[in-house]
Amino acid sequence: MAEKFTQHTGLVVPLDAANVDTDAIIPKQFLQKVTRTGFGAHLFNDWRFLDDKGEQPNPEFVLNFPEYQGASILLARENFGCGSSREHAPWALTDYGFKVVIAPSFADIFYGNSFNNQLLPVTLSDEEVDEMFALVKANPGIRFEVDLEAQVVKAGDKSYSFSIDAFRRHCMLNGLDSIGLTLQHEDAIAAYEKKQPAFMG
């Protein structure tokens, strides 16, 4: 079972860039691991650090600004997560501590992979995202409240409605990953197996 997602209130960091691809999110040289942990250290590695080893933080990259330390909501521009289909991208984001990404649009494969890893991708209009960027930049350290049950983001004095596919919403609200979904039908699977002839194994 995955962690349930109902509501989340968190610090917002504005990544004012469009077409952020998966190689920027987690560069290919860090993909050797097969577990989901440890990727956060290399999130946006080529942007966060001035050296290949990740020892010299880039002071001009927004994730390194003191006011955004501990951010759990990423605000981005259109076509976030484009490029190759690596599932390591949402792994890196969640391992770093992100729970939500808000953008005008997402690459399809990244969008699906996010739900598989309990990372909520929230799609809003360009105008709404523009408003959020202005709000965050004017108020560094602001926190947004994301309510998946109500499908609303509360940002400052405004509320923004978003839409999520009913099945994906159900899975996130109940903490159901592919294993959890299978276990929901455990009794039916066991009953089916009992009916099978012994020679079928």
From Swiss-Prot:
<dbReference type="InterPro" id="IPR000573">
    <property type="entry name" value="AconitaseA/IPMdHydase_ssu_swvl"/>
</dbReference>
<dbReference type="GO" id="GO:0009098">
    <property type="term" value="P:L-leucine biosynthetic process"/>
</dbReference>
<dbReference type="InterPro" id="IPR050075">
    <property type="entry name" value="LeuD"/>
</dbReference>
<dbReference type="Pfam" id="PF00694">
    <property type="entry name" value="Aconitase_C"/>
</dbReference>
<dbReference type="InterPro" id="IPR015928">
    <property type="entry name" value="Aconitase/3IPM_dehydase_swvl"/>
</dbReference>
<protein>
    <recommendedName>
        <fullName>3-isopropylmalate dehydratase small subunit</fullName>
        <ecNumber>4.2.1.33</ecNumber>
    </recommendedName>
</protein>
<comment type="similarity">
    <text>Belongs to the LeuD family. LeuD type 1 subfamily.</text>
</comment>
<dbReference type="GO" id="GO:0003861">
    <property type="term" value="F:3-isopropylmalate dehydratase activity"/>
</dbReference>
<keyword id="KW-0028">Amino-acid biosynthesis</keyword>
<keyword id="KW-0432">Leucine biosynthesis</keyword>
<keyword id="KW-0100">Branched-chain amino acid biosynthesis</keyword>
<dbReference type="InterPro" id="IPR004431">
    <property type="entry name" value="3-IsopropMal_deHydase_ssu"/>
</dbReference>
<comment type="pathway">
    <text>Amino-acid biosynthesis; L-leucine biosynthesis; L-leucine from 3-methyl-2-oxobutanoate: step 2/4.</text>
</comment>
<comment type="function">
    <text>Catalyzes the isomerization between 2-isopropylmalate and 3-isopropylmalate, via the formation of 2-isopropylmaleate.</text>
</comment>
<dbReference type="InterPro" id="IPR033940">
    <property type="entry name" value="IPMI_Swivel"/>
</dbReference>
<keyword id="KW-0456">Lyase</keyword>
<comment type="subunit">
    <text>Heterodimer of LeuC and LeuD.</text>
</comment>
<dbReference type="GO" id="GO:0009316">
    <property type="term" value="C:3-isopropylmalate dehydratase complex"/>
</dbReference>
